[in-house]
A protein has these predicted regions:
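Conserved ABC ATPase "signature" region
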Residues: 100-115
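Helix-to-loop junction immediately C-terminal to a conserved catalytic motif
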Residues: 49
Length: 193
């Protein structure tokens, strides 16, 4: 499976955010899309996901998909967690094959003991990001796209989250966006200017 981004451009309020961006995302690839704030990182992911249209260029989905439709495991800049539910319930609700107990076990890989049973509104911002990462990784996906997944994390939380992501990659391509200096220690780096 390959996602081909060809000469994608996007303007906001007359300002170019993306200009002729081309990127090949193939099975097993890991790409850190690095850029300053307002460089178009989020717009690029949203275009790949089909949530926004490019002004110019195209995104092509090539090859065979593992599932009936193109599935994306995503971490957005906003948490998109369901308030009133525990961390484990938020993880379990995205995959009907995952029980709340299995979600708790997965969350224990990143969160302090007992945290999985807390309502998500009682978690720290970094802990909520970790719930989002696990939720994106537990969904059967053709690709995983993560928009600044480590925002607000301490170095220890970031390293733990990176190790978790690395442990579950297999052949599913991963694209993350990050600020300069925050790229993954594995895979390749693509700079937006």
């Amino acid at each position: 499976m390959t996602i081909e981004v060809l000469n994608v451009s996007k303007n906001y309020e007359g300002k170019p955010y993306l200009k002729n961006v081309s990127l090949d995302i193939s099975s097993g690839s890991v790409i850190s899309v690095v850029g300053a704030k307002k460089s178009g990182k989020t717009a690029l992911l949203r275009i790949i996901m089909g949530l926004e249209e490019a002004d110019d260029g195209q995104v092509n989905l090539l090859g065979d998909y593992k599932y009936d439709r193109f599935n994306i495991g995503a971490v957005f800049q906003d948490d998109h967690l369901c308030p009133g539910f525990t961390a484990a319930q938020n993880v379990a609700m995205v995959n009907e094959r995952i029980s709340v107990r299995a979600a708790e076990e997965e969350l224990e890989k990143l969160l302090p003991a007992g945290t999985a049973d807390l309502p998500v509104e009682d978690l720290t911002p970094a802990q909520r990001r970790m719930v989002c990462i696990i939720r994106a990784c537990i969904i059967p996906s053709d690709v995983r796209l993560m928009d600044e997944p480590f925002a607000g994390m301490t170095e220890e939380e970031r390293e733990k989250s990176i190790a978790y992501i690395h442990s579950i990659l297999a052949n599913t391509p991963l694209v993350i966006t990050c600020l300069p200096g925050e790229e993954l220690p594995f895979g390749r780096t693509f700079h937006l200017t």
